[in-house]
From Swiss-Prot:
Matches recorded under SUPFAM superfamilies: CheY-like
Single GO molecular function: phosphorelay response regulator activity
Protein name: Uncharacterized response regulatory protein VC_0693
UniProt keyword list: DNA-binding, Phosphoprotein, Transcription, Transcription regulation, Two-component regulatory system
TM region(s), chain numbering: none
Segments forming domain HTH LytTR-type: 135-236
CDD domains linked to this entry: REC_LytTR_AlgR-like (cd17532)
Source domain of life: Bacteria
Pfam families: LytTR, Response_reg
Gene3D superfamilies for the chain: 3.40.50.2300, LytTr DNA-binding domain
GO terms of biological process kind: regulation of DNA-templated transcription
Modified positions (4-aspartylphosphate) in chain numbering: D54
Record organism: Vibrio cholerae serotype O1 (strain ATCC 39315 / El Tor Inaba N16961)
InterPro entries recorded: CheY-like_superfamily, LytR-like, LytTR_DNA-bd_dom, Sig_transdc_resp-reg_receiver
Length: 237
């Protein structure tokens, strides 16, 4: 049996799909989410085999959410929507399948069988996903979309992944690995990514370490492993 997460801003649509999947006897719904941010968090927490995802949702669309998933660990994604004009883009972005609302039981059964066959293969090849020009973050009971060009750096700690601009700090459900692959942020430390355009100066420290100072005055550590590469990116050879 496969595990599934349902992401749709319409509760009735989620409940109806959950009933259909339960009737199939092959899919266990382990969670539901009403928006993309909540959905991304539950994908990381629950690690479902498949996500049934609506496309048109507030703030962040289903297609945008797909581009935020780590291609090495992402579940299969089945879009469930009332609009057929997104089908081509969905498949170009590596969606597993595309179902139209109201969901036809026979069509859903075919999708479930394909999912079961795919799961048996256990062949999840890396996929190329679109780059991100903004980072979805949460804070103070709101969703914040931070443009990449405003981000100075991002780092991980016990609380999760934090994104720092000149004026504010916010928390993101995206991993540093995804941010490194999907944005212009570059690795400078095992726990830090930095926007090269935000660097004002680099202080060389002892033992081959360094510290970057951003235009806003924030300090960002640089490990020996990444110092040489960073200097080359900035034109120092």
């Amino acid at each position: 049996m496969l595990s599934a997460l349902l992401i749709d801003d319409e509760r009735f649509a989620r409940e109806e799909l959950a009933e259909l999947l339960a009737e199939s006897g092959q899919i266990e719904v382990i969670g539901q989410a009403s928006n993309a941010i909540e959905g991304l968090k539950k994908i990381n927490q629950l690690k479902p085999d498949v996500v049934f995802l609506d496309i048109q949702m507030p703030q962040i669309s289903g297609i945008e959410l797909l581009s935020m998933l780590d291609p090495e660990t992402m579940p299969e994604v089945v879009f469930v929507t009332a609009y057929d004009q997104y089908a081509l883009q969905a498949f170009e972005d590596n969606a597993f399948d595309y179902l139209l609302k109201p969901v036809d039981t026979e069509r859903l059964a075919k999708t479930v069988q394909r999912l079961l066959r795919q799961h048996k293969k256990s062949d999840y090849s890396p996929l190329t996903q679109p780059s991100l020009d903004q980072i979805p973050c949460t804070g103070l009971n709101r969703i914040v979309l931070l443009p990449i060009n405003e981000v100075e750096f991002a780092y991980s700690d016990i609380s999760g992944v934090n994104v720092q601009t000149a004026q504010q700090k916010a928390t993101s459900q995206l991993t540093l690995k995804v941010l490194e692959e999907k944005t212009a942020l570059v690795r400078c430390h095992r726990q830090y990514l930095v926007n090269l355009k935000a660097i004002r100066e680099i202080k060389l420290l002892e033992n081959g370490l360094a510290e970057m100072i951003t235009h806003a005055g924030h300090k960002v550590p640089v490990s020996r492993r990444y110092l040489k590469e960073l200097k080359e990116m900035l034109g120092f050879y």
